[in-house]
Structure formats: structure tokens, C-alpha cells
Design a protein with these regions (language model features):
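Metal-associated gating/positioning segment near the N- to mid-region
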Residues: 1-37
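Gly-rich Lys/Arg/Thr-decorated short loops/hinges at beta-loop-alpha junctions or inter-strand turns
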Residues: 8-13, 39-43, 115-124
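Alpha-helix-loop-beta-strand connector modules within alpha/beta enzyme cores
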Residues: 24-45, 89-100
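Histidine/acidic residue-rich metal-binding segments in metalloenzymes
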Residues: 55-143
Length: 143
């Protein structure tokens, strides 16, 4: 209701739900629920990995067939370069985007803002730009 009241006519449903949108049954459920509500068009994202755990590739082909428009482990980086490489290969084959959460948690964990003069002045642990850049560069090379 809120999206439509604000003039929004379409929304992307991210996969970080319970249950995680990591298979065709959940993708189909999300689509049907959106259609039944009839307010805004709902475009489901599928998870890249099963359970958004970053261990096993989710069934991308099946989720595309069920209506997934893109893939993401929404809020969680895919740490495995091999898993991301395979996901990107599927994305290319099915012409769907991957929305990666680019953040190296070994650098970012515990950070609350961008690293810099202000984080130092406030005494807060900053997140270095490299935490994002490492994953961006990796994924560009893998793509």
C-alpha cells in the first residue's frame, strides 16, 4: 500500500526473506502474492546461493523460469570467487543481472561509517574504501 500511495508502480522483492527466495517455488509464491494483491507490479529477485549462505549455487535457471528478474545475496557478499564466477556465467546465459553486495567483511566488520577524518574525529571504526573495491575488481575480472 505504501509504495502505491507514494506513486510507486513496481517493486523488486529482494530475496532476504523467510524463507529465502532461493528456489522456483518461493519465486512463484512471491509473484503470485504480488499479482493477487494487485497494487504494484512485483519483480522477484532470487538468491545467488542456497539460503544466502554463500556455499552452494541456487537454481538460477529454474528461478528465471519461475519469474526471477535478477539475483543477489542481498546484504551478504558472496565470498567464494568460484561461486560468483559460476553465478555470473548463469547470469550471462539467461541475460539477468547480478546485484552483488560488494563488501570484504574482513575489512568492514565492526565498521559504522566510511573510514576517514570524520570517523577518526568521532572515534568510530571506519570502513575502508578497499572493502568494497576488492569485490568490485574481483567481480569485474570474473565477469
Amino acid at each position: 500500500h505504501s509504495a502505491v500511495a507514494g506513486g510507486i508502480t513496481a517493486v523488486c522483492a529482494m530475496p532476504n526473506t523467510k524463507p529465502v527466495t532461493d528456489n522456483q517455488a518461493v519465486v512463484g509464491f512471491v509473484k503470485r502474492q504480488g499479482e493477487a494483491a494487485g497494487y504494484a507490479r512485483v519483480y522477484p529477485y532470487g538468491a545467488i546461493s542456497v539460503g544466502q549462505k554463500g556455499e552452494t549455487l541456487a537454481e538460477i535457471a529454474e528461478m528465471v523460469g519461475a519469474g526471477a528478474v535478477a539475483f543477489s545475496d542481498d546484504g551478504k557478499p558472496v565470498e567464494s570467487a568460484q561461486l560468483m564466477r559460476t553465478a555470473l556465467e548463469y547470469a550471462r546465459a539467461f541475460n539477468v543481472p547480478i546485484a552483488e553486495h560488494c563488501e570484504d567483511m574482513t575489512l568492514a566488520r565492526g565498521g559504522s561509517m566510511n573510514e576517514g577524518i570524520m570517523s577518526a574525529k568521532l572515534g568510530l571504526k571506519g570502513i575502508p574504501a578497499e572493502a568494497e573495491e576488492i569485490y568490485v575488481i574481483r567481480d569485474i575480472l570474473l565477469a
